[in-house]
């Protein structure tokens, strides 16, 4: 019987089985940021321990950094202290740190792949829930807590429970104006925010195989919103084309050997799965959320569900969502006014995201009264976008072009909603208060849909705003 990629990677990295049913796994790559690492380093110091393998550990600053004015000290003294702590800890332990202005600073899940640190067959850990992003390369990537960050720093291992594997096939061809963000929202809408509990998700099928790497990253990024701890795609030629020539990947003859080695991680044709689910790409439309979980999503031309249409166990959360969002059952989502538009986050702030939006945004203007921000995922992305004229397209349209960071995705920096503002967002979470205001509202969608909402001043169909029919 064949094995899945997940099983192969697990077995190759299993140091030992633990008495509690978990396994101790060797971690190939440990990524750090400023929020979940200070306490971990503090615990390490209290125990009198050093970082076990500094050369397998890399750090950046992303969550707390201002994206408008980076003059130090920051206005927020806590943010400044977290940055200073990361600088001191990485310096003390000999860890590579991509600091502000280094040319490689950015959102941790953007810079890992961008630098070629993320590679097929790896086990990867980071103190951030969206570490599943790296699974797009055929890696098994764990989002971990602070005490586990300490464990990996000290031992380069992680205690973990082996998961079941669900294969999610997306077959067919996506229509113009439909992107990976729509695919993952569609999947979560149908499988639920708890549907992936206890599972690793393996994404495949012709639509996934046709995706570029940055689209696959979007898909894997939001596995966690569907309840799965792990999401991955089998490595292929698309993976190799993306990785070739990046700073941390093998070069020359070692590159050819690496590709042969990486292909061996692919799930075997006769691998057995605990569950298989198939979706048709042609049935997926531009999708947006209407509530307070990513699973509360509908096609752009749909209506918010009537309570009686929902399973009984979903009705209390739906009622809570309707009250919080100020929506009513049966209401069309299209046409709802927005006050803020945000393109950014570890889900959708890569160069391909910005290129695609700029392609259609050129010649359009942000609606008066809408505050629109675009926040590149890294200094490299920002630099390339400037070189290609992408940044200027956004500026001309009326978007604020910001510096890299997590920005509005979470309320840990100055980019926040005010009052009950409604934000059309390319991020990954629409929880109550997620964007800083206890009454702020978030509607998740693809970057192009965010741009369409910014131009229209309301939630809109990008295919109509930008005339996408028959394009691509």
From Swiss-Prot:
Its EC number is 4.2.1.33. Its cofactor is [4Fe-4S] cluster. It catalyses: (2R,3S)-3-isopropylmalate = (2S)-2-isopropylmalate. CDD domains: IPMI. One of its GO terms (molecular function) is 3-isopropylmalate dehydratase activity. SUPFAM superfamilies: Aconitase iron-sulfur domain. GO terms for biological process: L-leucine biosynthetic process. Pathway: Amino-acid biosynthesis; L-leucine biosynthesis; L-leucine from 3-methyl-2-oxobutanoate: step 2/4. Signal peptide: none annotated. Keywords: 4Fe-4S, Amino-acid biosynthesis, Branched-chain amino acid biosynthesis, Iron, Iron-sulfur, Leucine biosynthesis, Lyase, Metal-binding. Disulfide bonds: none annotated. Binds 1 [4Fe-4S] cluster per subunit. InterPro entries: 3-IsopropMal_deHydase_lsu (IPR004430), Acnase/IPM_dHydase_lsu_aba_1/3 (IPR015931), Acoase/IPM_deHydtase_lsu_aba (IPR001030), Aconitase_4Fe-4S_BS (IPR018136), Aconitase_4Fe-4S_dom (IPR036008), IPM_dehydratase_rel_enz (IPR050067), IPMI_cat (IPR033941). [4Fe-4S] cluster binds at residues 346, 406, 409. It holds the Pfam family Aconitase. Belongs to the aconitase/IPM isomerase family. LeuC type 1 subfamily. Catalyzes the isomerization between 2-isopropylmalate and 3-isopropylmalate, via the formation of 2-isopropylmaleate. Heterodimer of LeuC and LeuD. This is 3-isopropylmalate dehydratase large subunit. It comes from Thermus thermophilus (strain ATCC 27634 / DSM 579 / HB8). The gene is leuC.
């Amino acid at each position: 019987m064949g094995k899945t990629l997940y099983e192969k990677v697990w077995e190759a990295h299993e140091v030992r089985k633990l008495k509690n049913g978990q396994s101790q796994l060797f971690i190939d790559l440990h990524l750090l940021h400023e929020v979940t690492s200070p306490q971990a380093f503090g615990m390490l110091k209290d125990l009198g321990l050093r970082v076990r393998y500094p050369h397998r550990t890399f750090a950046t600053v992303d969550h707390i950094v201002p994206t408008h004015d980076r003059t130090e000290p920051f206005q927020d003294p806590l943010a400044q202290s977290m940055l200073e702590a990361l600088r001191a800890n990485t310096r003390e332990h000999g860890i590579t740190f991509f600091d502000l202005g280094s040319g490689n600073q950015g959102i941790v899940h953007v810079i890992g792949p961008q630098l070629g640190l993320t590679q097929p067959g790896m086990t990867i850990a980071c103190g951030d829930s969206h570490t599943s992003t790296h699974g797009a390369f055929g890696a098994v990537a764990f989002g971990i807590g602070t005490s586990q960050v300490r464990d990996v720093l000290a031992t380069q291992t992680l205690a973990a429970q082996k998961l079941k594997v669900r294969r999610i096939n997306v077959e067919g061809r996506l229509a113009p104006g439909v992107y990976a963000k729509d695919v993952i929202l569609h999947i979560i809408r149908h499988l639920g925010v708890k549907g992936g509990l206890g599972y690793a998700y393996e994404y495949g099928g012709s639509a996934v195989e046709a995706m570029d790497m940055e689209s696959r990253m979007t898909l894997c990024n939001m596995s966690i919103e569907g309840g799965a701890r792990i999401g991955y795609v089998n490595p292929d030629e698309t993976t190799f084309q993306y990785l070739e020539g990046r700073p941390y990947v093998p070069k020359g003859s070692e590159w050819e050997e690496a590709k042969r080695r990486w292909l061996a991680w692919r799930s075997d044709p006769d691998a057995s799965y605990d569950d298989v689910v198939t979706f048709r790409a042609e049935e997926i439309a531009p999708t947006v959320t209407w509530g307070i979980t990513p699973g509360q999503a509908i096609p752009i031309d749909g209506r918010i569900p009537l309570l009686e249409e929902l399973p009984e166990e979903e009705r209390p959360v739906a009622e809570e969502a309707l009250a919080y969002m100020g929506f009513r059952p049966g209401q069309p989502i299209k046409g709802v006014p927005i006050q803020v538009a945000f393109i950014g986050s570890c889900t959708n702030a890569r160069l391909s995201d910005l290129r695609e939006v700029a392609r259609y945004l050129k010649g359009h203007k942000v609606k008066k009264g809408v505050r629109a921000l675009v926040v590149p995922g890294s200094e490299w992305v920002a630099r390339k976008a400037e070189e290609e004229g992408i940044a200027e397209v956004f500026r001309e349209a009326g978007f604020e072009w910001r510096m890299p960071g997590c920005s509005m995705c979470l309320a840990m920096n100055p980019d926040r909603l005010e009052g009950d503002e409604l934000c059309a967002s390319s991020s990954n979470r629409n929880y109550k208060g997620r964007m800083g205001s206890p009454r702020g509202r978030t509607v998740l969608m693809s970057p192009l849909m965010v741009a369409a909402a910014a131009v229209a001043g309301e939630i809109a169909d990008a295919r109509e705003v930008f005339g996408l029919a028959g394009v691509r």
